[in-house]
């Protein structure tokens, strides 16, 4: 699974995913400060699952009909430490990672929502 992490994602989350064996491309390392539209284009170019903490991607996907071919995972873990966020995200990927592609998913404390077929 190709994963593209938006720069809104804490570096600790990216590192934890990498430590767990996931190949993660990180916008902050590649092309910092690009627009959300360009991030979505980059994800589509490589059919990557886009991981973001930016709710604007929900608007791009649902209101404007701009799809991410690999799917989107929105991380809503406000107020938690970066270490705890990393643990929650890796646990979610271990349990539900196979369900994330081609869906719009939200990871929040104690809950994972997966909206099929975006």
Description of each model-found segment:
Residues 58-92:
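Mid-chain, well-packed structural core segment of small domains
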Residues 2-48:
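N-terminal first-folded block
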Residues 95-118:
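Charged phosphate-binding loop/patch that engages nucleotide di/tri-phosphates or the phosphate backbone
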Residues 31-45, 54, 73, 77-86:
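Histidine- and aromatic-rich ligand-binding microenvironments
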Residues 25, 51, 73-75, 105:
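Hydrophobic/aromatic beta-strand patches that form the interior of the parallel beta-sheet core
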Residues 43-63:
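Acidic, metal-binding active-site segment of PIN/NYN-like and related structure-specific nucleases
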Residues 14-15, 36, 60-63, 84, ...:
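Short glycine-/acidic-enriched loop or helix-start segments at secondary-structure transitions
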């Amino acid at each position: 699974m190709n994963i593209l992490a938006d720069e809104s994602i804490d570096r600790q989350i990216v590192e934890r995913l990498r430590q767990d064996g996931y190949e993660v491309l990180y916008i902050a390392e590649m092309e910092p400060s690009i627009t959300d539209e360009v991030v979505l284009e980059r994800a589509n170019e490589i059919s990557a699952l886009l991981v973001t903490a930016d709710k604007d991607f929900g608007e791009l996907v649902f209101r404007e009909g701009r799809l991410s071919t690999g799917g989107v995972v929105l991380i809503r873990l406000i107020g938690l430490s970066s270490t705890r966020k990393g643990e929650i995200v890796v646990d979610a990927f271990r349990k539900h990672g196979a369900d994330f592609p081609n869906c719009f998913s939200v990871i929040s404390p104690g809950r994972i929502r997966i909206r099929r077929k975006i």
